Amino acid sequence: EGFYICAFRKKGMLTGSFRIPKQKNPVSETVEFKDIMRTWLKHPDQWTIRQQDRFVVAYPAKYKQLIEYLNSQFICISTGFGIGELRGKTVVPQHALSMLKDLNTKAFNKVELTLERALSYLRCEALTLPEAAAGILLLTYENVPLGFVKNVGNHCNNLYPKEWRIRKL
């Protein structure tokens, strides 16, 4: 949840002021699941939601014009943060959404975990939550969001990034 930009200047290049030109054809907002994702944010009017391939990203609306200009002028590796991934006819929330302060926790079924189960989740170990509803669940520890799982009844598919898992304690 921050704004970062990096630019390099070659020696001998001219420097000067910079203005963002007005766009003649603004980029259209065509996100199929946009209404669903807006419920995931406490203040959806403060965010711009865009689809990039099968991923959906969000960034602060106040930077919309700047980000669209930079995307049109440069090859941007990443803009915003991932809030969802389109998988067939469904959308799966991404882990970055669970870390957002503007996350609307009421939009998801929440499951409070014990310390042992929270550590098990963060190790990407198998979890079973038979008492919880089926579907996407927001896991919390002491009311702090940890991430998402997809509960399919007899087990949960862990949506925590594998490269972030705890290997040793």
Model-derived features with residue positions:
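Polybasic, low-complexity RNA-engagement segments
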Residues: 11-169
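Conserved beta strand-loop-helix elements of the APE1-like EEP
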Residues: 3-13
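A general secondary-structure signal for short beta-strands and their flanking turns/coil
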Residues: 1-3, 134
